[in-house]
From Swiss-Prot:
Protein name: Protein PAM71, chloroplastic
Naturally occurring in which organism (per UniProt): Arabidopsis thaliana
Low complexity bias: start-end ranges: 22-38
A cellular component annotation (GO) from this entry: chloroplast thylakoid membrane
PROSITE patterns documented for this protein: UPF0016
Residues on Lumenal, thylakoid side: 135-161, 210-228, 297-315, 370
Keyword vocabulary terms for this entry: Chloroplast, Membrane, Plastid, Thylakoid, Transit peptide, Transmembrane, Transmembrane helix
Domain of life where this protein originates: Eukaryota
Changes seen on gene knockout: Defects in photosynthesis and reduced growth rate. Pale yellow leaves with reduced PSII activity. Altered Ca(2+) and Mn(2+) partitioning in chloroplasts and reduced Mn(2+) binding to PSII.
Transit peptide as recorded in UniProt: 1-73
Localization, UniProt: Plastid, Chloroplast membrane; Thylakoid
InterPro entries: GDT1-like (IPR001727), GDT1-like_CS (IPR049555)
Designated gene of the protein: PAM71
């Protein structure tokens, strides 16, 4: 009987105690459903030691559940960060696509205008050409092309005009900013080689086109009232006047043209990665720079201005002057293109370039008249 009363007295009625605070209490404002099930769903043994083991298991389960919830929230945050990063990358790609499409469309419009002008000029020249004279002159085309560099003209004047025109056309141009930005991220020597190589090839192509137009005019001259008119010189004057007026209008109207050119150059350069060392990295930088500058320069103002100068001036003088102008502008870009803007205004450079276009057009007109 005494043992029965002792055993009955040891049966203390159980009251669910408050679980101790855990390290994960700050991550949740209320106990989770799994922790409530862990505390109240199962009958609690009477013995204190057994009860302590039970609470230890509950706390272990509680920590496990809270860890899973915390990890899930971290996973959600990582997903959100990845989503934002992906969205920013897609937005950058869309901006780059729009930039490339607009640049291609602008170059295409310029090329279409010039080709339309050349087509009209060629049609007028053919209409004013004597058929018998044209037929007799066609066999001399090969001989004219072979001796194409025999008529060199005044090399000094061609050099001076090409140097001044190209130098002031390239300062502040997109090609200038591309060279400056690439030189800030890569070796200045490799960037100069790639940029100058692309501009040199472009200059040779422009001079060949200009001289071809010049010798076609010699084979099929334009006759007006018994007088032969130099249609190549007239076309050169029209091109120079067109680019001179357009440059001056851009200088007057476009306040943020330099910023726009710089942003386009930054987007173009952001797609190139020339990091590394050694011969392979230098070759990759040269090839990437060459391709980027060649595409950016094709159909540009300096491209057609070189064609116009080559059609009316000495080809060797134009090549030497254009290469010297491109080399000087590229050297300034790779050595300190960002510092140049502190001393020269983009609008002032545009005014000088536009005036030079008009001056050379006037000089060509004077040569035609005399």
């Amino acid at each position: 009987m005494l043992s029965l009363n002792l055993s009955e007295s040891l049966r203390i009625p159980f009251q669910n105690p408050r679980p101790p605070k855990s390290d994960f209490s700050s991550t949740s404002s209320s106990p989770s459903s799994s922790s409530r099930r862990c505390v109240s769903a199962y009958p609690i043994p009477i013995g204190f030691s057994v009860r302590n083991q039970y609470f230890s298991r509950c706390l272990t389960q509680l920590r496990r559940n809270e860890s899973q919830q915390l990890g899930f929230r971290c996973f959600q945050r990582n997903d959100a960060a990845c989503y934002l990063e992906k969205a920013e990358s897609e937005e950058h790609d869309r901006n780059l696509d729009v930039l490339v499409e607009s640049s291609i469309a602008h170059s295409r419009r310029e090329i279409q205008r010039v080709l339309m002008f050349l087509a009209v000029s060629g049609s007028v020249a053919l209409l004013g050409t004597d058929p018998a004279f044209a037929a007799s002159s066609i066999p001399n085309v090969t001989q004219s092309l072979v001796t194409s560099f025999g008529d060199l003209g005044d090399i000094s004047s061609g050099f001076a005009s090409a140097f001044l025109l190209i130098f002031f056309s390239e300062l502040g141009d997109k090609t200038f900013f591309i060279a400056a930005l690439l030189a800030a991220r890569n070796s200045a020597a490799t960037v100069f080689v790639g940029t100058f190589g692309a501009l040199g090839i472009m200059t040779i192509i422009s001079v060949v086109l200009g001289r071809t137009f010049h010798y076609v005019d010699e084979v099929l001259p334009f006759r007006f009232g018994g007088t032969d008119l130099p249609i190549d010189d007239i076309a050169a004057v029209c091109l120079l006047v067109y680019f001179g007026v357009s440059t001056l209008l851009d200088a007057v109207s476009d306040e943020g043209k330099a910023d726009e050119e710089q942003k386009e150059a930054e987007l173009a350069v952001s797609e190139l990665s020339g990091n590394g060392a050694g011969i392979v990295a230098a070759a990759n930088t040269i090839i990437s720079t060459f391709a980027l500058v060649f595409v950016a320069e094709w159909g540009d103002k300096s491209f057609f201005s070189t064609i116009a100068l080559a059609a009316a001036s000495s080809p060797l003088g134009v090549i030497a002057g254009a290469l010297a102008g491109h080399g000087a502008a590229t050297l300034l870009a790779v050595l300190g293109g960002s510092l140049l803007g502190n001393f020269l205004s983009e609008k002032a450079i545009a005014y000088v370039g536009g005036v030079l276009f008009l001056v050379f057009a006037a000089v060509t007109v004077a040569e035609i008249v005399t």
